[in-house]
Amino acid sequence: MLVHAHPDDESTGTGATMARYANEGATVSLVTCTSGELGEVVADDLAHLRGNPDALGEHRRGEIAEALRELGDIRHHWLGGPGRFRDSGMAGEDTNDAAECFAKADRDDVTRAMVEILRAERPHVVVTYDDTGGYGHPDHIAANHALMYALGPAADPAYLPELGEPWDVPKVYWMTLPRSFVKDVQAAGIEGFEPFTVPDEDITAVLDGRDHHAKKLAALRTYRSQVSLDDGDFFATLVQDPRFAIEHYVLVRGERGPGSGPHNWENDLFAGLD
Ligand SMILES: CC(=O)N[C@H]1[C@@H](O[C@@H]2[C@H](O)[C@H](O)[C@@H](O)[C@H](O)[C@H]2O)O[C@H](CO)[C@@H](O)[C@@H]1O
Ligand SMILES: [Zn+2]
């Protein structure tokens, strides 16, 4: 199970991982916390969505449905239901304080909604952002908190038993990028990734999803409101590189399974589970 903040985050950060496990017949579920109502609309033929959060949210809900079909058989949940928690906007924007935004949502409401999904899906592995949200977006940080604060209650038989049988998630990973990745892409002229990386020795798992790079690209292409892969900017250049389908994780809960290479990286998130 993967927990992401906005439509398109799942494909950008973990699309190849999702495609690999869906291809292998594993049960892959996704929790998206907001519909991304405040995103910048990059496609001029979608200009009518600019300044119309409800319309953009509805449009992005359609985009993610199409994107997930490109990745494989993915079970999709909106945290609290579609539109329940709304996009908080980029860090520092006034919208970060809007009553209905995800970053300001009531902790009990968020935990209840996440526990309901955790107990329904009973995932052996859960993936989300690190506690910086990857790049500091309030909704990404809130998504990390939504999962991490729900792990205890989900496993507690005394917590809202009406939400289902308790479930203790065996393994949790946070997504990240190794510092070596930056050196690789800098050689290709792609700058700006350094702040979002960790030392290679801090990585615990690497999923080489290059066999699924095409699916990751196809999923990203469905997000026309947010992503243009043909404008030659650094992101468009990055995603075309097959190395973009190599996805890296740090284990933050559970036992590390067998690995390989100089840092003994796991190459399977289910490593060590029976
Ligand atoms: C990848 C991601 O998390 N995107 C978020 C982010 O989008 C950025 C935002 O629209 C900003 O104004 C742009 O300049 C930047 O290029 C975008 O990546 O924040 C949005 C608002 O919270 C969110 O909807 C989008 O999914
Ligand atoms: Zn996001």
Curated annotation (Swiss-Prot):
Zn(2+) binds at H6, D9, H140. Binds 1 zinc ion per subunit. Its cofactor is Zn(2+). Keywords: Hydrolase, Metal-binding, Zinc. Its EC number is 3.5.1.103. Coiled coil: none annotated. The keyword Zinc applies. GO terms for biological process: mycothiol biosynthetic process. One of its GO terms (molecular function) is N-acetylglucosaminylinositol deacetylase activity. Pfam families: PIG-L (PF02585). InterPro entries: GlcNAc_PI_deacetylase-related, LmbE-like_dom_sf, Mycothiol_biosynthesis_MshB. It is an enzyme of class 3 (hydrolase). It catalyses: 1D-myo-inositol 2-acetamido-2-deoxy-alpha-D-glucopyranoside + H2O = 1D-myo-inositol 2-amino-2-deoxy-alpha-D-glucopyranoside + acetate. NCBIfam families: mycothiol_MshB. Belongs to the MshB deacetylase family. HAMAP family: MshB. Catalyzes the deacetylation of 1D-myo-inositol 2-acetamido-2-deoxy-alpha-D-glucopyranoside (GlcNAc-Ins) in the mycothiol biosynthesis pathway. This is 1D-myo-inositol 2-acetamido-2-deoxy-alpha-D-glucopyranoside deacetylase 2. It comes from Saccharopolyspora erythraea (strain ATCC 11635 / DSM 40517 / JCM 4748 / NBRC 13426 / NCIMB 8594 / NRRL 2338). The lineage of its organism: Bacteria, Bacillati, Actinomycetota, Actinomycetes, Pseudonocardiales.
